[in-house]
């Protein structure tokens, strides 16, 4: 089941429905996204989220300890690939080109989704209302992503697939094409994006190969 926030789903608050935990959490995330988009994070209360989701405030606490935890879940589910990159090594291959192709498939499928673009728009809007808040969450999101990336890089180094002296800073900079592509997708949409996936992905791949390939 898709565990990312679905922005287009209307939540019926007229009658309490008993749902599995995963579905209830999904409704909370959908409701929270709508409220955050309308009012901003600071002005949105758990009561507003509960009302839109059609549950009580205590119903939210059964799944999330705070509004911050809800916001973090929205960001991580929309902007960070849900499967660990280390799963790319499960086939046993040591071919760096093959691994990178599968890695980029995962990255661009995540960042090109409507959920990711809508969430990035929310972050941009929120940065005007409360820049300190967005910087804090941006750092948390980056840390969450880099922890997984570090584990992936270490596993590749252990297998002799990539250079042993690759730093996370270098790896982050090599990912700049995907960040630019997400910004342009957010600004222009898929139809009018001046930089196509067919242009940006080969550049991203080449930068990663130059950085990671054993010398």
Language-model-detected regions and their locations in the chain:
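Short amphipathic alpha-helical segment with a characteristic S/N-K-E followed by hydrophobic residues
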Residues: 28, 66-72, 81, 133, ...
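C-terminal effector-binding regulatory domain of bacterial HTH transcription factors
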Residues: 210-215
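Short helix-capping/turn signature of helix-turn-helix
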Residues: 41, 64, 124-130, 140-141
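Amphipathic alpha-helical linker/stalk segments
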Residues: 74-103
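Basic, helix-initiating cap at the start of DNA-binding domains
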Residues: 1-39, 43-55, 62-69, 94
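Hydrophobic/aromatic-rich alpha-helical bundle segments in the mid-to-C-terminal region
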Residues: 135, 154-207
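Helical hydrophobic small-molecule/effector-binding pocket
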Residues: 98-129, 178-180
């Amino acid at each position: 089941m898709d565990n990312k926030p679905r922005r287009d789903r209307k939540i019926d608050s007229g009658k309490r429905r008993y749902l599995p935990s995963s579905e209830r959490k999904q409704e909370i995330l959908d409701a929270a996204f709508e409220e955050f988009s309308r009012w901003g994070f600071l002005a949105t209360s758990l009561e507003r989220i509960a009302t839109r989701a059609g549950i009580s405030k205590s119903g939210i606490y059964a799944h999330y300890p705070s509004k911050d935890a809800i916001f973090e879940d929205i960001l991580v589910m929309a902007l960070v690939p849900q499967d660990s990159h280390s799963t790319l090594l499960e086939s046993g291959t040591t071919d760096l080109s093959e691994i990178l192709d599968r890695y980029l498939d995962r990255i661009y499928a995540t960042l090109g989704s409507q959920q990711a673009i809508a969430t990035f728009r929310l972050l941009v809007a929120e940065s005007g209302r409360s820049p300190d808040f967005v910087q804090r969450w941006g750092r948390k999101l980056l840390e969450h992503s880099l922890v997984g990336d570090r584990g992936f890089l270490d596993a590749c180094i252990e297998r002799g697939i990539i250079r042993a002296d690759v730093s996370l800073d270098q790896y982050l900079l090599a990912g700049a094409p995907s960040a630019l592509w997400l910004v342009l997708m957010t600004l222009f949409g898929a139809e009018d994006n001046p930089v196509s996936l067919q242009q940006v992905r080969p550049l991203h791949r080449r930068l990663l190969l130059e950085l990671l390939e054993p010398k």
